[in-house]
Amino acid sequence: MHRLYKKTITYLLSKDFLVTLLVLSIMLAIFWYMLWASQLSRRTILIDTLPDFTIYFTFGIVLGLIFAGRALYSRSVKKKLKHMLEMFLYGFVLGFLSIVNIFDVYVYLFPDDVISYTSDYKIVFPGPSTGKSSRCEAGIWVKDIHTGQFKQLCTNREILFKKRRQGMDALWITARVNKLGTYIVDYRFTYK
């Protein structure tokens, strides 16, 4: 028993275990960030002129080139090209996915102002997509005054029944805004 305990302690303090723990922690943090940022993007409206996809793609290519450059020095000549291509692909995917919602996060974290306004709305069934194969029960289309764009928000029949009364034909929207877009904090049904 003492021998097993000693081996376990030795392994837990080894460099391999600590490196594995560090890599898993970083990957878990990236995964958490991607989930959090994708939730933010459901209520964020970016301006039309922002070349977001080009920036995501460029960042992925740059990170892929960094990974491929690092791989250039680590393999023998026979497998070098294949390893470089694999590392480029890994770097590209990691870079692309980790930055894909960065502008939504920026709008959420760094608002220049908080505004409130009324907007017309339209309720549709079913609502926006919430994943690969699921959808919200209902959706509310609203027009953002700051960007001039329409956004579909997720809701359900129960919320509509509780919060909406006959004759309520507008939404009172509270939003955080900056030069890149709008994050809708809250909305309430109201009378015009």
Predicted regions and their residues:
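Short, Lys/Arg-rich, polar N-terminal cytosolic tail immediately upstream
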Residues: 1-11
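Membrane-embedded alpha-helical segments of integral membrane proteins
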Residues: 15-72
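Internal/C-terminal transmembrane anchor helices
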Residues: 79-106
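Structural detector for short beta-strands of small beta-barrel domains
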Residues: 111-134
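OB-fold (S1/OB) nucleic-acid-binding surfaces
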Residues: 129-154
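Short nucleic-acid-contacting surface segments enriched for D/E, G, S/T with interspersed K/R
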Residues: 156-174
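OB-fold/S1-family single-stranded nucleic acid-binding modules
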Residues: 176-192
